[in-house]
Amino acid sequence: MPTILVSALEASSNVHLEELRHNLPKDYRFIGVFEGKNALYSPREFSVMGFRDVIGRLGFLLKAHKEMVQLAKQADMVLLMDSSSFNIPLAKKIKKQDPHKKIMYYILPQVWAWKKWRAKSLEKYCDFLGAILPFEVGYYQKKAQYVGHPLLDEIKYYKKDIKGETLVFMPGSRKSEIAKMFPLFVKAAQILEQNEGFKRRVLVVPSFFKGLDLKALYGEDIKLFEISYDAHKSLFEAEFAFICSGTATLEAALIGTPFVLAYRAKTMDFLIARMLVNLHYIGLANIFYNALNNETPGLGESQLHPELIQHFLSVEGLLKAYEEMDRERYFKESLRLREYLASGSTRKIANEMAFLLNLT
């Protein structure tokens, strides 16, 4: 019975992990940080955003880090997913503790956007790097392979045309995101009803919010929406979506649902990020679309969907994006994006895990 130490702190990473587990033998035992049984911590306990938020929880993060290093002694291999600020130092300490411990990094840090030096650290401390973006392999010397994209395994619904019956609202998976995005989405929904008549409004809620008091999280205005825990099905049925930045934007693009990306960070966090990251776009679909058109990812002129960031974000901007988007062009180009990513990644990662465990 192989034991795998997992560090999956993000909601999206846990969706990918769940799909991966369906493709692994049932006798694989998971320990560490993930959503599920036998976890040391739930990813919800790491749900912080912004530099000040991290500083406020530094004691907990250091404690969890130390416990994960100790837990690695029980594992046959280590699987790290995303969350580079936590996982790269973790890889370093585990490798120092046991140089023979096999470490896989799946869902790589965005070294193409900032901190390119992290690529050297990853190759030094990890044994296999599973890249889910075709262009990011070029930032590594030898250990990175493009394995496909996990969303192409997970998405079961793809639009055949641009039609839809609902408006979908996805204000994020973190409390800080919801607090900023949801009030704007509510106002946009109300104005759209005044201008165009009633349309079904669907609020997509993260699956790990099940059992929680949603009214306490979203406020009284949640009553204006139908609630869905199935993002893919809801996007498939939608005419248009209003989405907080994140994996959901790429999901919408692959499914073929027109959308606008909306995001607003704390002013200090935004200014620090602007100094560290040189990108025109923050949406994965736009970044991939640049690469697809042979442009520098995140810095190209081509755009698949509108982005409303920081002071450019307003209710008026959301409404304008809804009204003016060229839906037919968007749908045609979203099909090209799906072809660019080529295939899913889950089986490839499962095979590589078996190889690292000497099971093949």
UniProtKB/Swiss-Prot annotation:
GO terms for molecular function: lipid-A-disaccharide synthase activity; phospholipid binding. Its EC number is 2.4.1.182. The keyword Transferase applies. Pathway: Bacterial outer membrane biogenesis; LPS lipid A biosynthesis. It catalyses: a lipid X + a UDP-2-N,3-O-bis[(3R)-3-hydroxyacyl]-alpha-D-glucosamine = a lipid A disaccharide + UDP + H(+). InterPro entries: Glyco_trans_19. Pfam families: LpxB (PF02684). Keywords: Glycosyltransferase, Lipid A biosynthesis, Lipid biosynthesis, Lipid metabolism, Transferase. GO terms for cellular component: membrane. It is an enzyme of class 2 (transferase). GO terms for biological process: lipid A biosynthetic process. The keyword Glycosyltransferase applies. Condensation of UDP-2,3-diacylglucosamine and 2,3-diacylglucosamine-1-phosphate to form lipid A disaccharide, a precursor of lipid A, a phosphorylated glycolipid that anchors the lipopolysaccharide to the outer membrane of the cell. Belongs to the LpxB family. HAMAP family: LpxB (MF_00392). This is Lipid-A-disaccharide synthase.
